[in-house]
Amino acid sequence: AYNLIAEDYQLPRVHTHLYKRIPTQAGLGGGSADAAYMIRLLDERFRLNMGNAEMERYASKLGADCAFFIRSEISYATGIGDILAPADSESGNLNGYYLVLIKPDIAVSTAEAYATIEPQQPIKCCRDIVKQPIDTWRTELFNDFEVPVFKRYPELKAIKEKLYEKNALYAQMSGSGSTIFGIFGRKPVDIEKTFPNTFTYVCRL
C-alpha cells in the first residue's frame, strides 16, 4: 500500500507496527482491511486529501475487496468487489443488532475454496434481499462457498446450525471461511460456553 501511494505522492519513509485483533485465514478480510487502512492512514497523516473515491481506486489495485474497507459502510459490491453502492437493510441499517463471530481452529485455503466452488445464478438480487426484513434472509441470501467448504469441514455447518438454535436471525459463513457469523436481535448469552475452544466475538452494531 505504501509503495503504491508513494508512486504518485512524495512520502517520507515510515515505520509501522501492525497489531492484528482478528484471526488470520478467517474469511474476514483482515489483510484487505490492513491495506485499506494503510492508505487511509497515509492520506490522513500526510494530508494528501485524496478523498474516498481516489483511495478506493488505489485500494482496488491491491486486492479484490480492499476498496470495501475504505469507507467501512454496508455496501453492495459488483465487479471484482471494487464497484460499491449502498446496501441497507429494511430499517436503513443494522444498528442495534448484535453480531457474533465464531472462528474454530480451522484454516480454509482461499485458493482451494475458489477451485471447488460452483457459483449459482441467484433467483433474486442480494441487493433486493437485504432491503427485506432480516428474518427473510435465511431462505434467500446464500454464500455459495458454504456447499464445498461445509462438505469438507462439517464442523462449520454445525456452528451455523447452533447459531440458529441460539435464536440468530441470520447466520452465514464469512467469505470463504472459516468464520461463521450470526446476527441477533438481542444480545446472546453463553456464547463462549456454547462454542468452546474457538475464537468468539460479540458486539452491538
Residue ranges and their predicted role:
Residues 1-9, 18-23:
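N-terminal lobe of the biotin/lipoate ligase/transferase fold
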Residues 14-27, 169-171:
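Short pre-catalytic strand/loop immediately N-terminal to key active-site residues, enriched for Gly-Thr
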Residues 30-31, 173-178:
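Glycine-rich beta-strand-to-loop/alpha-helix junction loops that act as flexible
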Residues 71-170, 185-196, 201-205:
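Conserved, helical-rich catalytic subdomain that frames metal- and/or nucleotide-binding sites
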Residues 179-184:
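Short beta-strand->loop micro-motif that forms the acidic, two-metal-ion catalytic signature
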